[in-house]
Structures are given as structure tokens and as C-alpha cells.
């Protein structure tokens, strides 16, 4: 299986059979969210002059890089306003959804028009990194948005009806959390409790990984969780990371070590049924 990986410095592929790691794109980091349609792959690139993990530089002008099935860069998508501190992105309902944590907003792009959605009802929370919205997920036509909350309070999953975005409930889960998914029990939400180095669930399950976990692929047989060495933001581009492979009983099978590329931000598996991704299969990579 081929995993797409974003890090501080690079967009990478990892062949889980041969363990071969390849650089697909570099020099536009920090790279973060990965998503795909049936025909294209989208990657969020913050396009900074260095790959430091800033909390949204005032002059940051992030772009969405678009690749084909051969992982060739075909175009770049830019917005008519700054895309700052992009985190996870999602292709859903023929729209590209982009979390922009620095401005406390989610951007929605249908290919023609841009919409800026501010989930917080407080006007004072707009254009300030209050909730640090960082992860998106959809299941059963319900939209889920994760607020990291920067350690000021526990992280929270916001569950919305779609398409009216009417809030159904909030679920506190973890600290400085990333990623959202469920397994067999649709009421048991999982997330990476990044502050405590664990995967946790809303029913109390805990799986220790160590480091700072984020980035998830969930297939029928195996779970892949990314984690990076813990460091201050200005030093995160120098750390090592790894992807830990589990079976579906959460027993570790192996770990793939990644060095020289900084922290790991996201992982995806195009063409593979991945329940942690809004489009569960999507484009298939070709040679």
C-alpha cells in the first residue's frame, strides 16, 4: 500500500511493503492536509519561507497543490483572501473544505465560489486563533469539526447536521487533539490526544503511542497512526517521526521511521477504503 505523507518540509510517499520513502514535493512547507476526489489529490501547503510551525503568520499566503494519479503537480489553487495556518482539508459534496486555524474559520470552495464559515457564534472569535479548528470528518451526512483549543481547555468535537450546519451536539475529547473517526460503534468517537501521546475514544479506550500523534488511516485490516518527537514549534522541522501500524485489535505490527523531514502532519491512502477520510476510497494512484 502507498501512503501519502505530509511533513514540515515535504510531501512524501511510503510503500508499506518495501518501506521505500520517496519525496514528491518540497520547498513549500509546512505541508499539512491531504484529501482527494475521484480524479485529483489536494495538498495544503503553507508556502512559508521556512517550514517552522507558526501559529499563522500575518503575511502567510497558503496554497492548495493539486496532483494527478501519477503524483504530478498539475495546478495550484489560491484564494482571494489569505489561507493562514491551514490544517486538515477535506473533499466532500464536490467541495474543498479547508481548516484555517489562525482565523478560526473553515473555507469552502466549490470550484467557482469561496465561502468563509466561522463556526464560533461569537463575532469576537473571528480572525483570531481561539478554537484552533484543525480536523474535519463526515459520516451519515453529518459534519464533524474538531476544536484543538490550544491547551486552554479540553478539545471538542462539534457535530453538525448537513447541509444546514445546525449544531447537534459537542463532545469533549482529549487535549490538543487531532483527527476524528469511529469504528464499529458509531457513538464511540476516536481522536489523537496529541498532548498525552495517545489515541483515545469517547468511551474511555486509550492506546499509548508516545510522542505527538496526528495523521490517521483506518482500513478494514489495519490502522496507521502518525506520531512525531515532541518539540517546541520553532524546532518541529528538525524532529523525527514515524507511522505505527496496528491490526484492528490495536496490537502493534510495525513502525515506519521517517527522518530528515520534520514533524509528520497528515497521512492518507488514495484508492484504499479509509473510514477516517470523507471520501473513503477516491482516486487510485498509477505509475
Residue ranges of each PLM-predicted region?
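Repeated scaffold domains used in trafficking and secretory/extracellular systems
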Residues: 28-38, 83-90, 128-136, 175-182, ...
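Loop/turn-rich, solvent-exposed surfaces of beta-rich toroidal or solenoidal domains
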Residues: 175-245
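Short loop/turn segments that connect beta-strands within beta-propeller blades
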Residues: 16-19, 68-72, 109-113, 161-165, ...
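Blade-level signature of beta-propeller repeat domains, shared across WD40, Kelch, NHL, RCC1
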Residues: 238-287
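Beta-propeller blade signature
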Residues: 57-70, 156-162, 238-249
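Conserved beta-strand positions in repeat-built beta-propeller and related beta-rich domains
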Residues: 4-9, 43-58, 98-103, 145-152, ...
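Asp-box/WD-like beta-propeller blade repeats and closely related beta-sheet repeat scaffolds
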Residues: 73-92, 99-107, 114-132
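Surface loop/turn motifs at the tips and blade-to-blade linkers of beta-strand repeat domains
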Residues: 23-28, 77-82, 117-129, 169-175, ...
Amino acid at each position: 500500500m502507498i501512503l501519502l505523507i505530509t511533513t514540515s518540509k515535504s510531501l512524501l510517499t511510503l510503500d508499506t511493503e518495501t518501506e521505500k520513502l520517496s519525496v514528491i514535493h518540497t520547498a513549500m512547507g509546512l505541508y499539512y492536509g491531504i484529501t482527494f476526489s475521484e480524479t485529483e489529490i489536494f495538498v495544503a501547503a503553507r508556502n512559508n519561507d521556512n517550514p517552522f510551525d507558526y501559529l499563522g503568520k500575518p503575511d502567510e499566503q497558503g496554497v492548495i497543490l493539486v496532483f494527478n494519479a501519477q503524483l504530478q503537480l498539475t495546478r495550484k489553487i489560491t484564494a482571494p483572501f489569505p489561507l493562514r495556518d491551514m490544517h486538515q482539508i477535506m473533499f466532500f459534496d464536490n467541495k474543498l473544505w479547508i481548516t484555517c486555524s489562525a482565523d478560526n474559520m473553515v473555507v469552502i470552495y466549490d470550484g467557482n465560489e469561496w465561502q468563509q464559515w466561522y463556526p464560533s457564534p461569537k463575532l469576537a472569535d473571528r480572525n483570531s486563533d481561539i478554537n484552533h479548528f484543525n480536523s474535519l470528518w463526515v459520516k451519515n451526512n453529518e459534519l464533524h469539526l474538531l476544536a484543538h483549543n490550544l491547551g486552554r481547555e479540553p478539545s471538542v468535537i462539534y457535530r453538525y447536521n448537513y447541509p444546514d450546519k445546525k449544531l447537534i451536539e459537542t463532545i469533549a475529547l482529549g487535549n490538543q487533539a487531532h483527527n476524528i473517526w469511529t469504528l464499529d460503534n458509531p457513538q464511540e468517537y476516536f481522536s489523537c490526544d496529541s498532548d498525552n501521546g495517545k489515541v483515545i475514544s469517547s468511551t474511555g479506550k486509550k492506546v499509548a503511542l508516545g510522542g505527538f500523534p496526528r495523521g490517521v488511516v483506518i482500513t478494514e485490516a489495519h490502522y496507521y497512526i502518525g506520531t512525531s518527537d515532541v518539540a517546541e514549534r520553532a524546532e518541529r522541522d528538525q524532529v523525527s517521526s514515524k507511522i505505527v501500524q496496528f491490526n484492528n485489535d490495536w496490537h502493534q505490527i510495525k513502525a515506519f521511521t521517517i527522518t530528515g523531514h520534520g514533524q509528520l502532519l497528515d497521512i492518507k491512502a488514495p484508492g484504499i477504503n479509509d473510514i477516517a477520510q470523507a471520501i473513503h476510497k477516491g482516486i487510485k494512484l498509477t505509475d
